[in-house]
Amino acid sequence: MSERVILAYSGGLDTSVAISWIGKETGREVVAVAIDLGQGGEDMDVVRQRALDCGAVEAVVVDARDEFAENYCLPAIQSNALYMDRYPLVSALSRPLIVKHLVDAAREHKGGIVAHGCTGKGNDQVRFEVGFASLAPDLEVLAPVRDYAWTREKAIAFAEENAIPINVTKRSPFSIDQNVWGRAVETGFLEHLWNAPTKDVYDYTEDPTLNWSTPDEVIVGFDKGVPVSVDGRDVTVLQAIEELNRRAGAQGVGRLDVVEDRLVGIKSREIYEAPGAMVLITAHTELEHVTLERELGRFKRTTDQKWGELVYDGLWFSPLKTALESFVAKTQEHVSGEIRLVLHGGHIAVNGRRSQESLYDFNLATYDEGDTFDQSSAKGFVHVHGLSSSISARRDLGIK
């Protein structure tokens, strides 16, 4: 018997077509692996049945919601991960977890080939294949969408000709990827940068321009950088994300219209919805402002950016990312406390902070009675701090 192909299955157009295509073109059996990352929408049993209807000999569904939240979203929170200062890595975070479970399935189901439905223009092909090379370099990789130059039109035509059960038409060509951390929408009329997103693009968030809702004030509690409470109620990381998705999404928070630099060298436009992610990253960042020593905080902001770039670029398993996470873990030792935020009209406003680990000293900061800051020391400090600038300026101005 020829080797089985283990396919990363989303239930969408490309991977549904891939099941049938692989069977017809290679004669190999396909095992579809669908990962529940909290994406909602269709029931995973429906997704599993669709894979079987498309020709898979087996369809495996893995509930990885807590694993995704604890081992992938949490490091993103602690690294305040926003690629290009905006994108919270909605898709990028999920790929290494999918890779991990595909490799596990390949071992269990005696598959020597792993397959994905990524195009040659996107980042996901890199994330999948570098991940496979890192965890299981012995596995062969099949990428039919990329290697055989499928277009969406060709995929839709193939689906129609072969009665593949998938709800995508040429009039509604959006490509959507979603999980509990957020939702990504691309292609179609969104590829024209001047076109404004229409209402049907969004699903996780309400229209922030309506402003009919009452502002929602929420308190997020952290213990050593881990979100542990919402409004005083204990929560898991997954529960925190889910609750804040609902509450922030109802306020129109987390809508992002981004033109980003892809790893493959092109720019692309993406519409993201990440209400819970944006609230948690905002709250965590603010708590770090309160609890991290100045130089540590400054340096961590550079490592946060690098961590996000590594994950975006598909280097989740790289030695540098592993080393950076050891550093981040050290920085989180004192990141404990609560942040109060107001969610309304698409905006997040921090209006309160408290922490037993705070480095904010009221008596040093106040300008009122009780001020303990010795202002007499400031004059000498200013002179010494600016001495090198003063010396060079005198030289440049010809002042002896």
UniProtKB/Swiss-Prot annotation:
GO molecular function: argininosuccinate synthase activity; ATP binding
Subcellular localization(s) per the UniProt record: Cytoplasm
Binding site for ATP: A8, Y9, S10, G11, G12, L13, D14, T15, S16, G117
Binding site for L-citrulline: Y87, N123, R127, S175, E260, Y272
Enzyme class (EC, first level): ligase
Reaction(s) catalysed by this chain's protein: L-citrulline + L-aspartate + ATP = 2-(N(omega)-L-arginino)succinate + AMP + diphosphate + H(+)
Principal location: cytoplasm
Entry keyword set: Amino-acid biosynthesis, Arginine biosynthesis, ATP-binding, Cytoplasm, Ligase, Nucleotide-binding
PROSITE patterns: ARGININOSUCCIN_SYN_1, ARGININOSUCCIN_SYN_2
Gene Ontology CC: one annotated term: cytoplasm
Positions that bind L-aspartate: T119, N123, D124
EC numbers: 6.3.4.5
InterPro entries membership: Arginosuc_syn_C, Arginosuc_syn_N, Arginosuc_synth, Arginosuc_synth_CS, Arginosuc_synth_type_1_subfam, AS_cat/multimer_dom_body, Rossmann-like_a/b/a_fold
Pathway named in the protein's UniProt entry: Amino-acid biosynthesis; L-arginine biosynthesis; L-arginine from L-ornithine and carbamoyl phosphate: step 2/3
GO BP, one annotated term: argininosuccinate metabolic process
Similarity annotation: Belongs to the argininosuccinate synthase family. Type 1 subfamily.
Subunit details: Homotetramer.
Protein name listed in UniProt: Argininosuccinate synthase
Native organism: Mycobacterium sp. (strain JLS)
